[in-house]
Every structure is written in structure tokens, then in C-alpha cells.
Amino acid sequence: MSMSTSTEVIAHHWAFAIFLIVAIGLCCLMLVGGWFLGGRARARHKNVPFESGIDSVGTARLRLSAKFYLVAMFFVIFDVEALYLFAWSTSIRESGWVGFVEAAIFIFVLLAGLVYLARIGALDWTPARSRRERMNPETNSIANRQR
């Protein structure tokens, strides 16, 4: 790299370098200031979690159903797709009929995915037993007669 090239790079990027240095320095200043100025808790309940004035009971290791993670993933997927549709809607005049057909296909694929998720039971929060009873009402009536 010659001297003129490095000088050109510095000339183009000096503002970003100063911004980066100031931002990192400000973060360090706030962390150090909080460490020096922050209060110290010396009570015996220092590490006990406090939640809405209620003492915690049991362990914090709760097992969550995978349904919560599935719903979160579905939300993110459909949220990103809504962003695509919003971007398309802002440029609908420029895209014309071709863009409209492409968006219609995109929406159809979204609806097909939603129907598929509903059919496999990914959006169903009921237990498997009640789902079976709904799917096969004859089994439900036979089970009730045997009781």
C-alpha cells in the first residue's frame, strides 16, 4: 500500500474512526462510573431474586414446553414476511401487475404454510388426548358408554 493510498483511506474514514473511539470511550466511562458510584449490597439476601414482592419458591429451573419456542419461531417467521409485504406495498405502483402477482403468490405460500401448521397440530395447544377425541368422535362416544 503506497503512502497516497493510505492517506486517502484515512481521509475518507477519519470521522468513523473518531466516532468509534468516542463511543467505546463513553461506554467504558459509564461502566467505570457505575462501578465507582454504585451502591454495594452487603445484606445476607443480596443474591435472592426479588419478583413483585413475592418470595421465590422452588428452583428457577422450569421446563418449558417446546410449543413456546415453536410459537416464537412462527412469530418471527410471519413477522419477517409481514416486513416483506410492507416493503412491497410501498412500491406497488412501480412494480405493477407483475409485482402484484408475485405478492399474491407469496401470500398464497404463506397461507399454505399456515394451513399446514394447523393441520399437523403445531398451533394446537390442547393435549393429544382431546385432539384425538375431536378427530374421532366415535371413539369418544364408545369411551363414554363404557364408563
Swiss-Prot record:
Pfam families: Oxidored_q4 (PF00507). Its EC number is 7.1.1.-. Gene3D superfamilies: NADH:ubiquinone/plastoquinone oxidoreductase, chain 3. It is a multi-pass membrane protein. One of its GO terms (cellular component) is plasma membrane. InterPro entries: NAD(P)H_OxRDtase_bac/plastid, NADH_UbQ/plastoQ_OxRdtase_su3, NDAH_ubi_oxred_su3_sf. It is found in: Cell inner membrane. NDH-1 is composed of 13 different subunits. Subunits NuoA, H, J, K, L, M, N constitute the membrane sector of the complex. Belongs to the complex I subunit 3 family. HAMAP family: NDH1_NuoA. This is NADH-quinone oxidoreductase subunit A.
